[in-house]
Design a protein with these regions (language model features):
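Outer-membrane beta-barrel signature, preferentially recognizing the C-terminal barrel domain
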Residues: 1-3, 7-62, 69-97, 119-122, ...
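A generic beta-sheet turn/junction motif
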Residues: 10, 44-48, 131-135, 171, ...
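Flexible, solvent-exposed coil segments and beta strand-coil junctions
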Residues: 15-24, 67-76, 106-110, 134, ...
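Outer-membrane beta-barrel "beta-signal"
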Residues: 39, 197-210
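Gram-negative outer-membrane beta-barrel transporters
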Residues: 54-61, 79-150, 170, 174-176, ...
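Short, solvent-exposed loop/turn segments at secondary-structure boundaries
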Residues: 115-119, 152-155, 190-194
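One-face residue pattern on beta-strands with alternating periodicity enriched for small/polar residues
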Residues: 164-168, 176-180, 203-207
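Predominantly the C-terminal beta-signal and adjacent terminal strand-loop region
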Residues: 183-202
């Protein structure tokens, strides 16, 4: 079972009300973001669909990307259309189903940016394990991020490792319970400069489906 796909797409994004009018660094003169995206991908399933893998290469060319930059006509920061972007990269993934209960997966992405994009990492690697038996399910995974731009003006980058875990129990067809832990290694990191992300956090809840 092998599949090859080629795709070309054109897209745009209008600036949001928040970006234009709400709170600094708002800017009512923002223009829509526009881009062309080209992708070529290959995927295959083997061993009675227990093993799957894929590879994807892409090229993105766009203009008017909205980012936060120093105000050229005053102090502070201002949302601005930054001009053109030209990025390309590759993504790879693999997964294996040991049995109906256990499975593993991993993926890696590499991004080259001619013009750096805020909150976009150059390298991202993830590995995870999934468990599902009866009414119980659980998963855990570790993600490594390298070269994530948090401030384009200072070309500031972040590197960090995140470990997450979650589990759930389906009591009935309508009721389930879940728990989740994020950033269990309590990493100190930022996605946007000046806004530290939470350290280890835990949550739980109930889902009711009608």
């Amino acid at each position: 079972n092998a599949e090859i796909k080629a795709m070309a797409s054109k897209g745009f994004r209008n600036p949001t009300i928040r970006e234009m009018y709400m709170f600094p660094p708002q800017n009512p003169d923002l223009k829509p973001e526009k881009l062309w995206n080209y992708e070529l991908s290959f995927s295959q399933r083997l061993m009675d669909n227990r093993l799957s893998y894929g590879l994807n290469v892409f090229y993105i060319n766009g203009e008017n990307l909205i980012i936060r930059l120093p105000n050229p006509n005053g102090s502070g920061m201002l949302n601005q259309n930054s001009g053109e972007i030209e990025n390309w990269g590759a993504e790879a993934n693999v997964g294996y189903q040991f049995n109906p209960v256990w499975s593993v997966m991993a993926n890696y992405s590499w991004l080259h940016m001619e013009n750096p994009v805020l909150a976009s990492p150059e390298h991202k690697l993830y590995g995870g394990v999934n468990f599902r038996k009866g009414r119980w399910s659980a998963s855990t995974g570790i993600q490594y991020v390298k070269g994530l731009y948090t401030d384009l003006d200072a070309a500031t980058k972040e590197n960090f490792v995140l470990w997450d875990m979650q589990g759930s129990f389906k009591a009935t067809n309508y009721l389930s319970f879940y728990v989740r832990g994020e950033n269990l290694l309590a990493q100190r990191y930022e996605i946007n400069a000046g806004y530290p992300m939470p350290k280890a956090t835990f949550m739980g809840g109930v889902n009711i489906n009608f």
